[in-house]
Amino acid sequence: MRRAILIATLLSALIPAAGPLRADDGQRLLSVDHYVKVTSTVPALAGQAAQIYVRERVLTGVALRGAAAPDKVVLFVHGAGTPAEVAFDAPIADYSWMAYLAEGGFDVFAMDTTGYGRSTRPAPMNDPCNLAEGQQAQFVPALLAAPCRPSYPSQVTNIGSDWNDIDAVVEYVRKLRGVQKVSLVAWSLGGPRAGGYAAQHQDKVQRLVLLAPAYNRTSAAAAPTLPAPGAAFNTQSRSEFVANWDRQVGCSDQYDPAVRDAVWTDLLASDPVGATWGTGVRRAPATTTWGWNLAMIGGTRVPTMMIAGAHDKQVPPDRVRAAYDDLGATDKVLVDLACSSHNAQWEKNHSLMFEASRQWLTAGALGEQKSGVVRLGY
């Protein structure tokens, strides 16, 4: 009852009070913030209550129904550096992947795992001494007098804690929308996060869409001793963000600088602390990984679409092809996306990818094709 009152109150605030509801009010696109409580398994927070930030994009008409259509609920999972609300809900033109699917009738959620965006940030991430020494140098002398020894000499999060966060959000969404399964869309390190979660919870996952999944077929099957040694977290400056993108440009007009600038502004807004360090950086936890290997992916039967950007130098196309080949699902499609880097959702062929994902999430097929390679944008 409390949840129903909360939703009704929110919608009444978002729908204008003056005048009667119009026939098209059900097509109003909403943005709703949720905070999901989780008992953390992050070593620095073990056993403590943490909050996972979840953004929802949904049409008013869909939200008012309360219960969602069984195959129309989607959860986005981000990669190693960029929180989900920035990665998938870009605040410019038609570059929001979340909005595209929401306008197609999906109830769309995106989550930040612990250490990202608006979710709980473990305390070691507030100490620049916990950066690798090479990264500390950029903050001397403005933030640090000199390079310093770490107060927490271990990677902050791990794939197991990420899976724990994802499960908390999946359970929250299943209860909120009254569905048995949700579909997962993920990017980069989100591949092991969402793909690994799906492999272990195939009864909860409808379909998968994986953009540039960071697959390693020889990844260790079991966790090392945790927390694993190493820098606790990392940062990225604007110049590093731009340089990493530009090295992956392989065709003319691949991306619009205005989109790049909007994404960077949104990225800094998601990290108010990092925005004050030097000229402004985004912070992300170092994450220990294991598990999403040949054995795990080979046992996965969830229908899956994978997408490889032709010019991706972070997760090259042959690495995505390896994941596709090893996947145990019968229904699986590999999209070869032209003129695209690791940041395909912010580039010229984003609309082709968004539409391909909509088709897959709707029917488990791209056109009539349920398996094989599809080339788009050539």
Language-model regions, residue ranges each:
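Short, surface-exposed "cap/lid" segments of acyl-processing enzymes
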Residues: 61-110, 120-125
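Alpha/beta-hydrolase fold nucleophile elbow
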Residues: 177-188
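N-terminal cap/lid segment of alpha/beta-hydrolase-fold proteins
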Residues: 24-69
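Catalytic histidine-centered segment of alpha/beta-hydrolase-like enzymes
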Residues: 340-352
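Alpha/beta-hydrolase
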Residues: 218-307
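Catalytic histidine neighborhood in serine/cysteine hydrolases
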Residues: 327-343
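Conserved alpha/beta-hydrolase "acid-adjacent" motif
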Residues: 313-319
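Alpha/beta-hydrolase active-site loop
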Residues: 129-176
